[in-house]
Curated annotation (Swiss-Prot):
Topology class, membrane: Multi-pass membrane protein
CDD domains in the record: cytochrome_b_C, Cytochrome_b_N
Cofactor names: heme b
Cofactor remark: Binds 2 heme b groups non-covalently.
Pfam families: Cytochrom_B_C, Cytochrome_B
Described purpose of this protein according to its UniProt entry: Component of the ubiquinol-cytochrome c reductase complex (complex III or cytochrome b-c1 complex) that is part of the mitochondrial respiratory chain. The b-c1 complex mediates electron transfer from ubiquinol to cytochrome c. Contributes to the generation of a proton gradient across the mitochondrial membrane that is then used for ATP synthesis.
Origin species: Bubalus depressicornis
Protein name: Cytochrome b
List of residues binding heme b b566: H97, H196
One GO term describing the cellular component: respiratory chain complex III
Length: 379
């Protein structure tokens, strides 16, 4: 008699994806991030669901309802802070996951990579709309500034912004629709993640060497299930340390002031995970140019497979490319820092230099280094 997990139509799918899946024997902890992202998504959906039970998406009561969740709902404070800080953990895992893909050449799995970029955009959109919901000062002004960027689109810009707002300013209609979108998008993300996994399992996982591992595969369970459980425990430990000791560390104090359209905060800035893109946006004096640079800073990931000029897939044996990769990481950290600073000297010029360096590294320096490494192989 065959095992039920191998014969049952539904169990068979799960078995082939998580139990009997042939996995490379040498994948490192950088390959844990996919499962961690899955855990983050489930956690966000669950905490978000419980928050939605008590939240009201009306401009007059939204701020009060969040305060009510924290003060009066049983364990509401922990659910709220797990949701807010869970988003930060989500983005830490997400950026590390993308970085891993760039370092080890995982972008050569075209379908998997492109779905991943779409997922990144979807998660960013969800996080942005979620930040608007508490209806604090930074929620309101963040929504106003970011949605207003669409007015830079020629001809249709102004109409588009007013259509998104549902009026002539960010108001009740905007908040209600943002709540609706914020609720539905995580389920779309979950569906896309399944497609992402489907395409990955068509080719099998990459590994640190970038060399085919077809001759040396091991079953996913128990080897990588136990490894993923360790990763999950560390993720939950980090999240709970953040939630229980410094829940407001990554938030903005301005968001504890109810939204007031008549009073602009001195420094409008998004959550920390968008600061690098915000710095690129601000570094260009032209509105349309800034918006294009903002979109391209993420969309540039689509070009990664085209910019791959090396004969080797992974950067494991490419020291020049490794140096440039870590310079890129340092550059992104610099941009993140600049995004949180006021628009004044010397931050303006640092931001502009870091923005130019960002595009220069990805579009010119890294492909050139790969070509130099190719020629060195002939020696």
């Amino acid at each position: 008699m065959t095992n039920i997990r191998k014969s049952h139509p539904l169990m068979k799918i799960l078995n082939n994806a998580f139990i009997d899946l042939p996995a490379p024997s040498n994948i490192s902890s950088w390959w844990n991030l996919g499962s961690l992202l899955g855990i983050c998504l489930i956690l966000q959906i669950l905490t978000g669901l419980f928050l939605a039970m008590h939240y009201t998406s009306d401009t007059t009561t939204a701020f009060s309802s969040v305060a009510h969740i924290c003060r009066d709902v049983n364990y509401g404070w922990i659910i709220r802070y797990m949701h807010a800080n869970g988003a930060s953990m989500f983005f830490i895992c997400l950026y590390m996951h993308v970085g891993r893909g760039m370092y080890y050449g995982s972008y050569t799995f075209l379908e998997t990579w492109n779905i991943g970029v779409i997922l990144l955009f979807a998660v960013m959109a969800t996080a942005f709309m979620g930040y608007v919901l508490p209806w604090g000062q930074m929620s309101f002004w963040g929504a106003t500034v970011i949605t207003n960027l669409l007015s830079a689109i020629p001809y249709i810009g102004t109409s588009l912004v007013e259509w998104i707002w549902g009026g002539f300013s960010v108001d009740k209609a905007t908040l209600t629709r943002f709540f609706a979108f914020h609720f539905i998008l995580p389920f779309i993300i979950a569906a896309l993640a399944m497609v992402h996994l489907l395409f990955l399992h068509e080719t099998g996982s990459n590994n640190p060497t970038g060399i085919s591992s077809d001759t040396d595969k091991i079953p996913f369970h128990p080897y990588y299930t136990i490894k993923d459980i360790l990763g999950a425990l560390l993720l939950i430990l980090a999240l709970m340390l953040l939630v229980l000791f410094t829940p407001d560390l990554l938030g903005d104090p301005d968001n504890y002031t109810p939204a007031n359209p008549l009073n602009t905060p001195p420094h409008i800035k998004p959550e920390w995970y968008f600061l690098f893109a915000y710095a690129i946006l601000r570094s260009i004096p032209n509105k349309l140019g800034g918006v294009l640079a903002l979109v391209l800073s993420i969309l540039i990931l689509i070009l990664m497979p085209l910019l791959h000029t090396s004969k080797q897939r992974s950067m494991m044996f490419r020291p020049f490319s490794q140096c440039l990769f870590w310079i890129l990481v340092a550059n992104l950290l610099t941009l993140t820092w600049i995004g949180g600073q006021p628009v004044e000297h010397p931050y303006i010029i640092i931001g502009q230099l870091a923005s130019v360096t960002y595009f220069l590294l990805i579009l010119v320096l890294m492909p050139t280094a790969s070509m130099i490494e190719n020629s060195l192989l002939k020696w």
